[in-house]
């Protein structure tokens, strides 16, 4: 429990339209000036170093959630290190991440081949930091093969495009890493919306435009939203993601705009834990990733 507590992030969900107390007037600094001091995602990834038996990286403060890397970034870094240590992997099909402790300080990421079959490859990947083991993950890669089955039950939300939706990341004291993303609320509710269902559909994109078909970039973006359960919150509260499981539905997703639609729905929230599902949609209406998440909520 000590490690979980150390990795908590306090979501202060007061809207910017409310009067700002003097202690947080720094949020009045122009956004362009803030971004000029930030580390682009591509620069962050390029800074990963190869060691004898692992890859290492140190995170700047603008990529943190409180004092630790947020789950999506940790997942993306594990995938990047796995690719660097294993050439010619087929597309990622599924991954399971357990966030054991805070990802702080100099991070070391080691990937180990678990099994290589004719079409699928399983890799185990651990991330350690100053506090010990931070992330334990299993990644499954699989080559495409002919199939007589083609079925989909997922239905894309009928929402307006990002240009016609209001800004999403407009809270005071939101996590530092959120400034790396542009968000537009397409449906559902903002956190701390009294009486609303705990669900949201938000258009997301990296401010650092790059190869938007990269699964590493997509994982970092797919976990950028706060838990949907925080729609029900009445006060700011610390949260900590415990586990994150993803299934990749499109081996090579296409995206010409940079925008992805994240549809997050809280299934249950009780006894201090929330379970939710998130679906990531491409701009042309294809589901590319489904994720399940268990979150500890301290409040």
What annotation goes with each model-predicted range?
Residues 13-16, 34:
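Short hydrophobic targeting helices and cationic amphipathic motifs
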Residues 33-299:
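Terminal targeting signals and extreme-terminal segments of soluble enzymes
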């Amino acid at each position: 429990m000590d490690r979980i507590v150390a990795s908590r992030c306090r979501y202060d969900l007061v809207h910017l339209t409310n009067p700002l107390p003097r202690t947080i007037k720094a949020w009045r600094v122009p956004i362009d000036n803030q971004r000029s001091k930030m580390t682009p995602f591509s620069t962050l990834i390029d800074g990963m170093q190869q060691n004898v038996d692992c890859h290492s990286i140190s995170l700047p403060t603008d990529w943190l959630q409180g004092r630790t890397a947020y789950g999506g970034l940790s997942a993306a870094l594990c995938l990047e290190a796995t690719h660097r240590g294993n050439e010619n992997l087929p597309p990622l099909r599924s991954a399971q991440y357990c966030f054991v402790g805070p990802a702080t300080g100099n991070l070391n990421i080691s990937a180990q081949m678990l099994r290589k079959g004719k079409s699928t490859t399983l890799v185990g990947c651990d991330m350690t930091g100053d506090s010990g083991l931070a992330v334990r993950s299993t990644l499954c890669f699989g080559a495409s093969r002919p199939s007589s089955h083609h079925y989909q039950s997922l239905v894309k939300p009928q929402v307006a495009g990002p240009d016609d939706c209001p800004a999403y990341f407009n809270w005071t004291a939101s996590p530092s890493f959120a400034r790396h993303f542009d968000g537009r609320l397409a449906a559902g509710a903002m956190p701390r919306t009294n009486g609303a269902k705990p669900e949201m559909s938000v258009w997301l994109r990296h401010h650092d435009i790059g190869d938007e078909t990269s699964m590493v970039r997509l994982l970092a973006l797919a976990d950028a939203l706060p838990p949907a359960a925080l729609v029900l919150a009445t006060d700011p509260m610390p949260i900590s993601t415990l586990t994150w499981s993803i299934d990749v539905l499109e081996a090579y997703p296409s995206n010409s705009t940079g925008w992805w639609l994240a549809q997050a729905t809280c299934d249950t929230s009780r006894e201090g834990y929330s379970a939710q599902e998130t679906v990531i949609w491409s701009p042309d209406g294809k589901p590319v990733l489904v994720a399940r998440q268990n979150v500890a909520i301290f409040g």
